[in-house]
Amino acid sequence: NWTDTFKLFGIKRYAQFISNGSLNKIIEGEGNFREKGEYDLVIVDEAHNFRGATAGRYDDLQLICKTPRINEGLVKGHHKKVMLLSATPLNNRPTDLLNLLLLFQNARYSTIEGIQNLPVTFSSWIEDYDKLMRERKLDKHNERNAVFAKRTDELYEQIRTQVIDKVTVRRTRNNIKNVPAYKKDLDDQHIVFPDILPPKELMYELNGGLNDLFYSTMAILTDTPHPEDNPTGKGLHYARYRAVEFLQGEARKKYPTALHISTMLTGIYRVHMVKRLESSFYAFRRSLHTFLRITEDMIKMFDQNKVIIAPDINVKDKQTKGWELDRIIEYAVEKGLKEEDTVFKDEDFNERFLEMLKEDAKNLKELCKQWDEVSEDPKLELFIDKLEHEFFDKEINPTGKLVIFSESVDTVNYLTEQLQNRLHRHDILDVCASNRTNRQDILRKCFDANYAEQSDEFNIVITSDVLAEGVNLHRAN
């Protein structure tokens, strides 16, 4: 918690804190934020969130970082100090690393020793990496995994020694333990780094019919047809997220990056569906029914000859709430959108688009039917068995506390309900983005090893990735 940490060190009054999604407020002068030139030091936590240069928030952050300082103060020069914090600086593509460097470096006049032009320096690494990934994709049977791993390591070693080491202040656990001054400071404060054991997989089994359904479903989710890359694909088109790609004539000119947008959205939703299937059958069923509903809603738009494309107003949400199309159009116009840029007719689309929507709806209906008939949940059964007979063994868990992470909020809710009902435990706390603020105090009392006022009211916390970064949960062994 940055606010608490700055307060602890007595420097909170010198700082302002802002979330990634609100950077535009500084640019546009909204709220109580200072002018972008008034900041002397910019600290970016979890900097990997800015490795993609296409998002608007990247541009906002880069502008804030590179706007000259208005007041020099005791530190001379107009350039700001920029600190990017990341636990895994090399866990990025070369393109991502270049984007991060360009948040605080001049592209063609870098201050990094031995490197003047960053894009030129990175171009060969990016080319080698992309070539390596293409070759790896063609290796269908993973016969050259060791070769690819070796070549990737060699590539990143070059980037590390020539660039990353020169701009990185390392503070790894080994670094701190092996420097005498740091080690003494740890000893004086009675701080001990625990030895982290490697991950331990728990393998659950699917019976014959469920196993077949799982893998046939995975094929439908991933075998997306494509005229060039996968012409014989039998899976979902994800057409609901590709509307702009199939605009034609004058309508298409309004979306010059249509292919890029649809490719990106298709990839995101495909990964989302696969992750939901692997997370829990409950979460996957919910996603299936949602995907079917929004696909059928778009087909209904064609029936009314009014297809709305307006990402800024969340058309899907409005349809879920029962809004008529005319009301959604009026709402879009009220928000400053032009009707001619928002509402399209049947003839504005390639006829193949509606066919793809109907094919998706057919596949999704069948998947919904098949998964609605599944009552067993072997993953849950194995997990409950481990909870009852292993996870709270004093030999491996002397504190009797447990943290359970899931990428899916639906899985968090499902798991919380199942464990409370079946194990009759009342010490289970669920934490997601929607309730984190309200539960912060009790969470810290029960799980933060540094918190003065400790409690054992809750011994299990089930959470989404909202607690995966920057939160002390060390009472959970």
Region roles according to the model:
Residues 185-206, 228-460:
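Conserved Helicase C-terminal RecA-like lobe
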Residues 17-50, 54-80, 84-87, 96, ...:
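Inter-lobe coupling linker of SF2 helicases/translocases
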Residues 1-120, 355, 359-477:
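ASCE P-loop NTPase motor core, strongest for the SF2 helicase catalytic module
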